[in-house]
Amino acid sequence: MAAFKLADRLATLPPYLFAGIDKVKAEVAARGVDIISLGIGDPDMATPGFIIEAMKEAIARPANHQYPSYVGMLAFRQEVANWYDRRFGVSLDPATEVIGLIGSKEGIAHFPFAFINPGDLVLVCTPNYPVYHIATGFAGGEVQFVPLLEENDFLPDLDAIPEDTWKRAKMIFVNYPNNPTAATAPLGFYEKLVDICRRFDVIIAHDTAYTEIYYDEDNRPPSILSVPGAKDVAIEFHSLSKTYNMTGWRVGMAVGNPTLVAGLGKIKENMDSGIFQAVQEASIVALRDGDDFCRELRGIYRQRRDTVINALHKAGIQCRVPQATFYVWARVPQGHTSADFVTRVLQETGVVVTPGNGFGTPGEGFFRISLTVDNARLEEAVSRIAKL
């Protein structure tokens, strides 16, 4: 058999974050241990029935089985614009400022190819969703990580970035509400970031997949596009995955600066063939009619969050109370590294949590819990961890 060599861009990739965890998980499961997985952020609850019914109706229409538009149906893009106006007070032109995505991950992964040339500098706030820096590397860009530290409320210290770096930078990736830290960003942070990036002509790529999983109705996570002038420099990636329990449906959107949206569209027209049209029609119903469901979903996650936080605090494990996302970002006990601790937890208790350093160097000393099992299983999981 021929020995084919992987391209350098793949050969130099570190192992996928969850690959090593899955290997240990399989070994533990083979011993007959009851596994409770709080690792990957994949909702355990079903897509709501009204969306499923809309999908059933859409599937029955023959026209929906043809090639879709690579930018998304105009009706879908219009509903995205309607939702942004209702939720954030942001006005969008569905023809030029909205594009449909086969999940936000696809759009984020493709975006650097539209604007990053080999050697261009891209700032990536870390700990982070790995796709930001991996996609940048695939496009030939140079990555400079910007640390998110607890003493700064897991926000980047924009003033600590030298002016020369801002002058060189072509793009910055930010993500709030944040995965993995669960931090949120106030509007003032976005105002400062937009001001700097307008001054130095830096593209802002903002990942907002978790804006609808929040716990304070009086302090809802904003869109960066709420900031005057943000459209000059920003594109925002959003998804229906977490908002409506639709991770497997693969549907999302990117909105903002029309040049940035068009550039992403140019990549997509050459790389994919768009979102299955029946999924888009069901997504229109989700965006239009899903507010009550989202309110109920937040209530469930709030209960789960409180269960985990109370149990962790009783066990002496330090963590902040998250104001958004379905993650808890907790400190590992003294004397452990992140990797050592989560491996011990998995091997001795059967509970899967994620090591913080898997999201970047500043994540060392932390681990992430996903609130993606029911309350009883969460109580059992944290009880097992507390006995270590």
UniProtKB/Swiss-Prot annotation:
Modification sites for N6-(pyridoxal phosphate)lysine: 242
Binding site for substrate: 16, 41, 105, 129, 179, 368
SUPFAM superfamilies from the UniProt entry: PLP-dependent transferases (SSF53383)
InterPro entries xref list: Aminotransferase_I/II_large (IPR004839), DAP-NH2Trfase_DapL_Desulfo (IPR019881), DapL/ALD1 (IPR019942), LL-DAP_aminotransferase (IPR050881), NHTrfase_class1_PyrdxlP-BS (IPR004838), PyrdxlP-dep_Trfase (IPR015424), PyrdxlP-dep_Trfase_major (IPR015421), PyrdxlP-dep_Trfase_small (IPR015422)
Residue numbers binding pyridoxal 5'-phosphate: 70, 104-105, 129, 179, 210, 239-241, 250
E.C. number(s) listed in UniProt: 2.6.1.83
UniProt cofactor(s): pyridoxal 5'-phosphate
GO MF: L,L-diaminopimelate aminotransferase activity; pyridoxal phosphate binding
Gene Ontology biological process terms in this record: lysine biosynthetic process via diaminopimelate
Pfam families: Aminotran_1_2 (PF00155)
Disulphide bond pairs: none
Keyword Membrane: no
Pathway note: Amino-acid biosynthesis; L-lysine biosynthesis via DAP pathway; LL-2,6-diaminopimelate from (S)-tetrahydrodipicolinate (aminotransferase route): step 1/1
Catalytic activity entry: (2S,6S)-2,6-diaminopimelate + 2-oxoglutarate = (S)-2,3,4,5-tetrahydrodipicolinate + L-glutamate + H2O + H(+)
Keywords, comma-separated and alphabetical: Aminotransferase, Pyridoxal phosphate, Transferase
Function: Involved in the synthesis of meso-diaminopimelate (m-DAP or DL-DAP), required for both lysine and peptidoglycan biosynthesis. Catalyzes the direct conversion of tetrahydrodipicolinate to LL-diaminopimelate.
Subunit annotation: Homodimer.
PANTHER family: AMINO ACID AMINOTRANSFERASE, L-GLUTAMINE--4-(METHYLSULFANYL)-2-OXOBUTANOATE AMINOTRANSFERASE
Record family assignment: Belongs to the class-I pyridoxal-phosphate-dependent aminotransferase family. LL-diaminopimelate aminotransferase subfamily.
UniProt protein name: LL-diaminopimelate aminotransferase
Natural source organism: Nitratidesulfovibrio vulgaris (strain ATCC 29579 / DSM 644 / CCUG 34227 / NCIMB 8303 / VKM B-1760 / Hildenborough) (Desulfovibrio vulgaris)
